[in-house]
């Protein structure tokens, strides 16, 4: 495994990663009631940035007061939210790692109870609910769409102020951008619907506005072409998502982040043999992040055998939840902690969030590094004292 491309550097958003195992965006609902990042979140991300050179993508950051709809999800539209995130990015950078902020407008997928409590109106590309039991959203006007594009750009600027190395646009899983991209949710008859080109318009405008605001090489895009989560999945997503990816390439985005068809949200899913991401991987010439059901025993095959000529990075979600030292464990072929699905979304609860143990081997290595660092510091101090005496 040590010779695998998994351990080769990769440049994303202008920073050089030391390996190709990353942590994707994972909603955990541990922010405050007013959507501000908490000290508990700082500890969580700090734990998972203990192996230098690792890339972390945060849980989705809500771009504006009306863009949310999940309880205790963090936002990035207020100055105090920016300041709270800065404590987290500083911690991650102190550990020698890198961190990207995912940006989201939840759209029609907002939790109805949370939306009502916070005065959020459920909106989407069209007045189509994501399932029969869900509320019917209101179709956005073109003026409102323009404002949302602006909100994404402002949130991206806030993310850079907060110390993030870049941003990732959430264009997957049935949230607002995805609801415009696919014809199962978009039946508009204006410039934002009715054709492949028009359905790509919102994501294109967001990519362009965010790229203009912070530079396209600080921007990535997450897509889930085959996912059925939250009422999605076109009959044939290939032409539509090929168009989106082509536009992302034209705008010189840093990377694309693709969700495998074998997962739906945090669950494994059945999929047909022809449902692959190959069309997207073939189109894109830059770094590609792949997420969905990867295990330590199959990642080497993906990088070294399946896509040997592509700059692939593999993202581990559930495994990173339960293993703060995941990269170390994979590199040293150590067993993984089991994750507890029941604690994934327990609001403001430290259980199942910051209490997963590091491996004994990692803690021993960390202790040795601390001892070595202390000896080096002591030796340097002695040398400086000797120089002062000679003078």
PLM regions: where:
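Intrinsically disordered, low-complexity polybasic segments
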Residues: 376-384
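Flavin-dependent oxidoreductase catalytic cores
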Residues: 1-377, 389-391
């Amino acid at each position: 495994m040590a010779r695998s491309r998994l351990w080769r550097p990769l440049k994303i958003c202008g920073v050089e990663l030391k390996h190709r195992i990353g942590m994707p965006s994972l909603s955990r609902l541990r922010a405050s009631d007013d959507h501000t990042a908490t000290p508990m979140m700082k500890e969580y991300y700090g734990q998972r940035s203990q192996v230098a050179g690792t890339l972390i993508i945060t849980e989705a950051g809500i771009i504006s007061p009306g863009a949310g709809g999940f309880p205790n999800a963090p936002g990035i539209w207020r100055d105090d939210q920016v300041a709270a995130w800065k404590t987290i990015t500083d911690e991650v950078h102190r550990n020698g790692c890198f961190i990207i902020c995912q940006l989201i407008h939840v759209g029609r997928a907002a939790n109805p109870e949370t939306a009502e409590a916070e005065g959020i109106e459920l909106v989407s590309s069209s007045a189509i609910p994501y399932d029969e039991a869900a509320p019917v959203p209101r179709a956005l006007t073109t003026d409102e769409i323009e404002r949302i594009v602006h909100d994404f750009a402002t949130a991206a600027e806030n993310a850079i102020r907060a110390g993030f190395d870049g941003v990732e646009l959430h264009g997957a899983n049935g949230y607002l951008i995805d609801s415009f991209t696919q014809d199962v949710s978009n039946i508009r008859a204006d410039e934002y619907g009715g054709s492949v080109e028009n359905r790509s318009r919102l994501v294109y405008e967001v990519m362009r506005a965010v790229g203009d605001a912070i530079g396209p090489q600080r921007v990535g895009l997450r897509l889930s072409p085959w996912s059925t989560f939250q009422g999605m999945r076109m009959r044939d997503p290939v032409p539509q998502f090929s168009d989106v990816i082509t536009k992302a390439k034209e705008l010189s985005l840093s990377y694309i982040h693709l969700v495998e068809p074998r997962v739906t949200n945090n669950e494994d899913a059945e999929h047909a043999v022809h449902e692959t991401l190959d069309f997207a991987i073939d189109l894109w010439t830059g770094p590609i992040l792949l997420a969905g059901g990867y295990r330590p025993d199959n990642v080497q095959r993906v990088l070294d055998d399946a896509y040997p000529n592509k700059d692939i990075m593999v993202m581990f979600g559930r495994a990173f939840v339960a293993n703060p030292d995941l990269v170390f464990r994979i590199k040293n072929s150590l067993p993984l902690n089991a994750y507890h699905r029941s604690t994934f979304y327990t609001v403001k609860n430290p259980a199942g969030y910051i209490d997963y143990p590091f491996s004994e081997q990692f803690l021993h290595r960390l202790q040795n590094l601390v001892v070595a660092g202390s000896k080096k510091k002591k030796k340097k101090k002695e040398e400086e004292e000797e120089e002062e005496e000679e003078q």
